[in-house]
């Protein structure tokens, strides 16, 4: 494997009993790259992320992540422990220099002054910032994002997208983002994979300058093309078609 490879999947299948969830999934991620995975509900996106997080094992095929590389995952809900403060939540799992590392992570997500707050006193956006800090404190090589902004309002989502992009570009780790928000995928990702019925249906390279302008023609055109692909819409006549017939 290349020294620049952050992870790769080769011929990955995943079944639960007689139900096949992922079928012959193959892709790779280079160090410092951000990819997004989009598709309809139930297409296998979150199962794929669980394989990358080593929470599940593939039924067949190989998931490769270099030995020693740290992988962390952020979910749609912050999953903060309500009986612990912000600082204590971020320190969870650390063995050495816990307070200093946690304070640095809290600062990086712009929550200075909230260290001693309880989760119940935080807004939804602040809780997700704590959840992000809790992943960053471990200095991950790969960050997995499972619909991390799905429960937030539009303005807070935009702020969090900008924060994630800023930290990712500064630190140079790799990112795998699962999202239903096509605009979010085009805003953050270098490459977007569309999954249909457990298989990769199409791949889009996003060659737009950063920071990306959502109002630009190129952004709107790219997002619309991907959305039509997910929905199975023929952009020429607006009719629904089978995704399997589109190449």
UniProtKB/Swiss-Prot annotation:
ATP binds at residues 39-46. Its EC number is 7.6.2.14. It is found in: Cell membrane. GO terms for molecular function: ATP binding; ATP hydrolysis activity. It is a peripheral membrane protein. It is an enzyme of class 7 (translocase). It comes from the Bacteria. InterPro entries: AAA+_ATPase, ABC_transporter-like_ATP-bd, ABC_transporter-like_CS, ABC_transporter_ATP-bind, P-loop_NTPase. It catalyses: ATP + H2O + aliphatic sulfonate-[sulfonate-binding protein]Side 1 = ADP + phosphate + aliphatic sulfonateSide 2 + [sulfonate-binding protein]Side 1. It holds the Pfam family ABC_tran. Keywords: ATP-binding, Cell membrane, Membrane, Nucleotide-binding, Translocase, Transport. PROSITE patterns: ABC_TRANSPORTER_1, ABC_TRANSPORTER_2, SSUB. Residues 7-222 form the ABC transporter domain. GO terms for cellular component: plasma membrane. Belongs to the ABC transporter superfamily. Aliphatic sulfonates importer (TC 3.A.1.17.2) family. PANTHER family: ALIPHATIC SULFONATES IMPORT ATP-BINDING PROTEIN SSUB, TAURINE IMPORT ATP-BINDING PROTEIN-RELATED. This is Aliphatic sulfonates import ATP-binding protein SsuB 1. It comes from Shouchella clausii (strain KSM-K16).
């Amino acid at each position: 494997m290349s020294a620049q490879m952050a992870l790769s999947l080769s011929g990955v299948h995943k079944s639960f009993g007689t139900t096949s969830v992922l079928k012959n999934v193959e892709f790779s991620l280079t160090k410092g790259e951000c990819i997004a995975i989009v598709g309809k509900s139930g297409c296998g996106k979150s199962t794929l992320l669980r394989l990358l997080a080593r929470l599940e094992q593939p039924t067949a095929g190989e998931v490769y992540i270099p030995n020693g590389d740290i992988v962390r995952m952020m979910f749609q809900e912050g999953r903060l422990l309500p009986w612990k403060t912000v600082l204590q939540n971020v320190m969870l799992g650390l063995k050495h220099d816990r307070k200093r590392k946690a304070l640095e992570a809290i600062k990086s997500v712009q929550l200075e002054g909230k260290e001693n707050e309880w989760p119940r006193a935080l807004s939804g956006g602040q809780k997700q910032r704590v959840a992000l800090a809790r992943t960053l404190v471990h200095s991950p090589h790969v960050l997995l994002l499972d619909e991390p902004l799905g429960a937030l309002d539009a303005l807070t989502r935009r702020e969090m997208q900008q924060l994630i992009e800023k930290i990712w570009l500064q630190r140079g780790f790799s990112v795998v983002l699962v999202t239903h928000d096509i605009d979010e995928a085009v805003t953050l990702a270098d490459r977007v994979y569309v999954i249909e019925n457990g298989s990769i249906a199409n791949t889009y390279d996003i060659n737009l300058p950063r920071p990306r302008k959502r109002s630009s023609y190129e952004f709107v055109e790219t997002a619309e093309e991907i959305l039509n692909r997910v929905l199975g819409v023929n952009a020429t006549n607006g009719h629904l078609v089978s995704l399997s017939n589109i190449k």
